[in-house]
Amino acid sequence: MAGAGLVTIKRRIKSITSTQKITKAMGLIATSKLRKVRKKLEANNKYCELFSSIVNELAMEAEQNNIYIKGNKSNKKLYIALNSDTGLCGGFNANVVNELNSIRSKEKEDFLLITMGQKGKMYFRRLNYNIESEYIDIPDVPTIKETEDVVYKALELYRNGEIGEINIVFTKFISTIKQNVIVEKLLPLEVKKVEKRNFIVKFEPSADEMIEDIVELHLRQKLLNCIINSKVSEQSSRMTAMDGATKNANDLLDELNLQYNRERQTAITQEITEIVGGAEALK
């Protein structure tokens, strides 16, 4: 019986050791990917902030009844949900899904959804969301190219009056231990009043002529920034999850090795007792 127990424990130790090697490797890969995409986020944050300030200046000068500022007559909303293409990243995907579930429970009218990421596509289909478009296979270090089709589709719906608001639901990177799910409105533009200045901003051609073209660039830049935030958060969550799994495997291996040694000691003691008992019987 003791021998059978030792074999079972040894098999479990071997299985957990193999799993530990996988989680450790995945943690190292996530750390490497995190480092790369985080550098891009730092650079993109500065560019996005500057670009947004220019768009705000433009919006202040444009006619306020412009559809990109005042909005159109549609009450229907569009949400763009950013998820990962792969799993094993803790609660990263579940948090985005939960946020949209919360929004759906509060909204009076059903909204349209654009999903980005294989996991989002899978979850939202299962939950019977009104999905307009689906996009998968987003690179680990995304570029502006990944925003083209999504923004084109969203703007087409907005210009046709099928939707009156474009929002994005994504995970904003705060630090390696903190990421928050954010809902950000992209359209209509929210004009932020700036402090009184001692200079005048003049646009040529006029702000109204420019806004039609620049709003697409603005949306693409904002979406790219959100995707990069999402990718950094994903890799950070995966790194944390894999580190936790590796530590749990270590703890479990310590317990199993202790249990194995106890079982082995018991088996040896039993064998010695049987040998001594047999020798005594022969006297």
From Swiss-Prot:
Q: Does the keyword Cell membrane apply?
A: yes
The name under which this protein is listed is ATP synthase gamma chain
Species the sequence originates in = Clostridium kluyveri (strain ATCC 8527 / DSM 555 / NBRC 12016 / NCIMB 10680 / K1)
Q: Which PROSITE patterns match?
A: ATPASE_GAMMA (PS00153)
GO CC terms in record:
plasma membrane; proton-transporting ATP synthase complex
- Subunit structure as annotated in this protein's UniProt entry: F-type ATPases have 2 components, CF(1) - the catalytic core - and CF(0) - the membrane proton channel. CF(1) has five subunits: alpha(3), beta(3), gamma(1), delta(1), epsilon(1). CF(0) has three main subunits: a, b and c.
Which NCBIfam families would you find in this protein's record? ATPsyn_F1gamma
Which GO molecular-function terms appear in the entry?
ATP binding; proton-transporting ATP synthase activity, rotational mechanism
Where in or outside the cell? Cell membrane
Major subcellular site: membrane
Q: Which UniProt keywords apply?
A: ATP synthesis, Cell membrane, CF(1), Hydrogen ion transport, Ion transport, Membrane, Transport
Entry's family note: Belongs to the ATPase gamma chain family.
